[in-house]
């Protein structure tokens, strides 16, 4: 009798373990969010947003990106594929086609697209050919035909990188609706069309951006656009800037845009219901691009960025309440919150002379090479720390590619603001285990990276008149990101051990009971 009881108990435990496997994974990426943001601003957060996830889940306080450049594109691709840029090859929105010798957008078709005069709900001209590494969403879909994946972002590139080449992928179109591309589907499903017909996005865009609190409750003090009252008043603070005639641009640059994406995410969750049928497994990816937009425009030390986080926290709380209301058993959902990368601090004297002028660097370097080897177009261009040389010109002058690369690296190191310059030949010839060069090597893809990889000095950024801060450096303010995993029976805990962002995808794959993405060789996080 005791033996039968023990066997029955073991069977019940085994069944419970199987049932504990989540049927829905919600992956939330707050673009540009640094690891310390939740702790820094927790005094004004509500209990049901960021603090709920931190209180009920596993918080990894030492999660890093171990590669450079730490761009948004590289971060999203690493989160999605579970491998570093050296493998997945995505580190910028722009790459250089060696055949055409010109810059191309990685998610756009290179050949001209004949756009229809009639506006379509499904957009043309997009391609997923650059996304060669399998994503977590694609791995989930490959494990069963019944599984489903939905990815939502403000920007098309963010959505496409997270989704990969399969599944449902939506972003905010220039018309202000949620749209997709022909490479994903030929027409929008009814639940998306119904949301667009409600014109909720237009309602969110007309909302005025005002400070949520009085000035004494903010940690930051610098402000550019919004008015913050020193005392409580019946009259709410409001933004100095007028709403643009193009209301879509406002939706992409105001905190209310985060609310819009969470409202659409609720519809996505409803479209996935019921969640527990035929052992199905479903993934919902949400990328919030607006935090990065605001951080780059105003700086992470601005009241604008701080106020946006408070609004985002409220929107997140509302979404989590809705999400858990749909699931009678919370173990059936696992929620992951992380970031693609941090953002650089804003220098007090952040003028043009303190920036790295990429165009000026290209021109001066080309003049240097022309004086040394003969007049010609030696430089193709520069993007996200990668300098591309014109190989056709180098070979036509019968010069060694490695020699020209070395000359460029030596020249770059003499340029103000450059901390490190290493050639592609050096990265292919040796293995570096520590320091800046090791990070650059992990971000170097032989097929897509440039001829010389450049790292700037701390807090120095590239010249861009529309941004006061950006990511991409080798330093901790860009590499140190938040990571919280909540649900699926995970016990609340604060984990101080060091982990990396390429471990997230294989860890979630194990939690969900599916094969890890094909290119991922990172260790599963133990907890």
Where do the PLM segments sit?
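Substrate-binding rim/cap in mid-to-C-terminal beta-strand-loop elements of soluble/periplasmic
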Residues: 360-401, 470-512, 526
